Amino acid sequence: NIFLELPRQVGKTTSALIRYLYIYNFGSANSIITYLHKDMKASKENLNDTKRLRDMLPPYLQMAQEFSIVNGKKKKMPTTVEKIQNPITHNVINTLPSARNAMLASNLLRGKTITMLWADEWAFIKYNDIIYSNGMPALNTAFRNAARNNAPHGFIITTTAGILSDEAGVYAYKMVQNATRFNEQWYDLSYKDLMELIDANVNSIFVHIRFGYDELGLG
C-alpha cells in the first residue's frame, strides 16, 4: 500500500498507468483493478489512457482481442469507457465515480471485491475519509485472499499535495503523517526485515513516498 506524492506534471499518473497495464496484461489473472478519481470523467480518462498505452505495444503484446473462451464458450469481452476485461488473463479494470454526498461515499467501496485499488488525486476526492473507513474491511479481505495466491494486490494513492483548508486535503495530510516514510536505505533490507518495519506501524498500512522537483532533477 503506497501513498505517492509528487509535484504536478512529472509522471506520477503515467507511472501508475504503466504499472496497472503490466499487471492487467501480464502480471496476474482474474484480478479486479479499480480506478478512483475526484470525478467519473477523470476516472474514465485514466482508463482511456491505459488503452492508449496498450495500443503502443507491439500487436502480439496488446491482448486486445474482442472475444475470449470462457468455460468452453466464445464470449465477447467488455470494452467500454468504464470497464475493460483482458481476453487472455481475464483481469478487469473498472472505474468508479466520485461520491456526491456522505451516504454515497459510505457505499462506494463497501462489499466490493477489489484486488487493486488506485486513487488518483486522493487529496482532492470529496469524502475520502468516509470512502476509506467504510471500504477498507472489504478491501483488506480481498487483499489477503490475493496475497495467499501470490497475486498482486494493494491500495495505491497518487496525488499532489492537498489544500489544508479543505476536508479532503486535511484527511490526506493526516494519512501522510501516519504513514511509514520511505528512504533509500530500504534497498539494503531483506524482504522480511522490510515487512517487519512496515507492519510495526500500527497507525497506518501505507508507505509514504515523496519526491520534490529538486530530487527529481527538475528544480
Model-flagged regions — what are they?
Residues 1-219:
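Phosphate/NTP-binding elements of NTP-utilizing enzymes
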